Amino acid sequence: MSSVPEPSAALLQRAVAVRRAAVDLGQTDDGQRALALQAMADALTERAATILAANREDLERSAGEGLAPALMARLKLDDTKLAAAIDGVRKVASLSDPLGCRQLHRELDQGLVLERVSVPLGVVGVIFEARPDAVMQIASLAIRSGNGALLKGGSEARCTNEAVMDALQAGLAASPVSADALALLTTRQESLALLRLDGLVDLIIPRGSNELVRFIQDNTRIPVLGHADGVCHLYVDAAADIAKAVRVAVDSKSQYPAACNAIETLLVHRSIAQPFLAAALPAFAAAGVKLRGDAESVALGVAEAATEEDWSTEYLDLILAVKLVDDLEAATDHIRSYGSRHTEVILTEDAQTADRFLAAVDSAGVYHNCSSRFADGFRYGFGAEVGISTQTLPPRGPVGLEGLVTYRYRLRGEGHITADYANGSCVFTHIDRPL
């Protein structure tokens, strides 16, 4: 961690303020947190023109600096995108309270009762790149789950992020929740020093490039939730419905290619390759997708030859690698070798083949006959997502409120002592009670 600076006194002061506000926030009730979220949404609506003007400034500056097209797409915030993000804040307000949920209720002995109850994590630190809508998503989930949040967006979106945070804090100031529960970090030094705030920050969630995520994972003692790559695959089986497969494949790549849940490699069963590609090539061309294929797919019309590097590349662009495979096992072997355990899709009308794929592929999301783009917290009904995790341990996949809470054991007794159980004068009953 030699490359990570020590936190400044100013950063420590802000982190302590967020921590203190989080303690109070964790003790608010469901109604108070819902009111806070509605106030945040109202403030965002009132300041929409200011936020969009700030975003235009960011876009103009970033275009002049030569920001990559994929990042420009993520950076852009228009009326529709902003309205959807604000609606997402209101939807989070209407979600069931994730706190105080009793997960275990057990009588250990008469008068000695154990409960396991959901509680906030405390403070989350979120580092993300050119995604100004992420500020609204993360802040709403943090407040709903009773957590404070330190947020650091990419410098590309600095004007937008500041305008959004001003609105969010104004909303909190008019609510039962302290505005100190949210803080925006604005410099690279602060984002690096955040990694040293173990003791004040309970979880770090990186949202961005492979390099960003891996750097954070390698340079902090704080637990990290996230994924480093989004190399997603779609396999067209021999028993696929060609018209359906073309429609789903094109959507999975082109609906929003800069997203981590867009497919990067198309695997096609050799026996269906000729008729499928005959239908798919013009559809991909119409969507602006450039294909890079193995020798066999090039022979069937794919314009450009793929290299070994293409199989492991997250393009985040209108580029798709294509490979023909012998069977389901060859497809799943390729996915295991090159995939990032994010989201994988099979297109087939054979239910048994689909079940084998869903069981064999160890990714956070495995889909049958639908677009990979459904891998999203909002589409899952989570209201929004704080990030996507490809780790094996939970939370996994799109992470909503449930990923921002932990649990606490509460034991209530009447003067019970362990010595009475050690000498046999008392005996555990271990009777489960209704939740």
Curated annotation (Swiss-Prot):
Pathway this chain belongs to: Amino-acid biosynthesis; L-proline biosynthesis; L-glutamate 5-semialdehyde from L-glutamate: step 2/2
Record-linked InterPro entries: Ald_DH/histidinol_DH, Ald_DH_C, Ald_DH_N, Aldehyde_DH_dom, G-glutamylP_reductase_CS, Glu-5-SA_DH, GPR_dom
Function comment: Catalyzes the NADPH-dependent reduction of L-glutamate 5-phosphate into L-glutamate 5-semialdehyde and phosphate. The product spontaneously undergoes cyclization to form 1-pyrroline-5-carboxylate.
Entry GO MF terms: glutamate-5-semialdehyde dehydrogenase activity; NADP binding
CDD domains per the UniProt record, alphabetical: ALDH_F18-19_ProA-GPR
Class of the enzyme per the UniProt entry, highest EC level: oxidoreductase
Disulfide bonds: none
Entries under HAMAP family matching the protein: ProA (MF_00412)
One Gene Ontology term, aspect cellular component: cytoplasm
Broad class of where this protein is predominantly found: cytoplasm
Catalysed reactions, as listed in the record: L-glutamate 5-semialdehyde + phosphate + NADP(+) = L-glutamyl 5-phosphate + NADPH + H(+)
Domain of life where this protein originates: Bacteria
Native source species: Synechococcus sp. (strain CC9605)
One of the Pfam families matching this protein, by short name: Aldedh
Listed name of the protein: Gamma-glutamyl phosphate reductase
Positions of transmembrane segments: none
Biological processes annotated in GO: L-proline biosynthetic process
Keyword Plastid: no
Cellular localization per UniProt: Cytoplasm
Family listed: Belongs to the gamma-glutamyl phosphate reductase family.
Alphabetical keyword list: Amino-acid biosynthesis, Cytoplasm, NADP, Oxidoreductase, Proline biosynthesis
